[in-house]
């Protein structure tokens, strides 16, 4: 199924048009995506390992993805979590952390404080091949070892003190 994204300008004003995922953007066009950081009662973060055939394959990241045309970022976050790790969350559980503007997209980053048992997680094997809970120090070590997607690492360093 093809995905379509709403197009925004540099000020995140909707431009009353959509683009098919994979089609080229014009200068000054942006789309919106979301990312969710799960933190359990031990303070550990849930990360997933990207499928080897994807861009940055084998590296670790937080769950997230593109916001489909007509969706809010909260709706997209709930959908992406269900699709990628099989966990049901509610919009009310999302704590907005930050809006990050990068290259040609805006990323809304959410925090969810939730204990999720390993047996509750069902990975979309086309997207992710593994998951684990890591402490912030373990995540920092993984970043130093270049095991984490670079843009994810940058956002983590920018926001880690808010957790």
Regions found by a protein language model. Name each.
Residues 1-35, 41:
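Acidic, metal-coordinating catalytic segment for phosphate/diphosphate chemistry
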Residues 7, 38, 47, 111-112, ...:
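Conserved hydrophobic "DFG−1" position in protein kinase catalytic cores
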Residues 23-26, 54-57, 129:
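A short local loop/turn or secondary-structure capping micro-motif enriched for an aromatic residue
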Residues 33-64:
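A glycine-rich, hydrophobic loop/mini-helix early in the fold
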Residues 46-47, 62-95:
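The catalytic Nudix box helix
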Residues 57-58, 69, 96-163:
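Nudix hydrolase/Nudix homology domain
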């Amino acid at each position: 199924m093809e995905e379509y994204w709403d197009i925004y300008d540099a000020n995140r004003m909707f431009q009353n048009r959509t683009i098919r995922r994979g089609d080229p953007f014009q200068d000054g066009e942006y789309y919106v995506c979301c990312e969710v950081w799960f933190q359990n009662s031990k303070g550990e973060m849930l990360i997933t390992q990207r499928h080897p055939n994807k861009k940055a394959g084998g590296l670790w990241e937080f769950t997230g993805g593109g916001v489909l045309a007509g969706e809010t970022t909260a709706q997209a976050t709930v959908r992406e979590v269900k699709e990628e790790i099989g966990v049901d969350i509610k919009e009310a559980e999302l704590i907005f952390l930050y809006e990050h503007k990068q290259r040609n997209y805006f990323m809304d980053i959410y925090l969810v404080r939730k204990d999720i048992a390993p047996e509750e997680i069902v990975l979309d094997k086309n997207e992710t091949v593994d998951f684990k809970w890591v402490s912030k120090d373990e995540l920092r070590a993984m970043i130093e070892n270049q095991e984490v997607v670079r843009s994810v690492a940058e956002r983590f360093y920018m926001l880690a003190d808010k957790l």
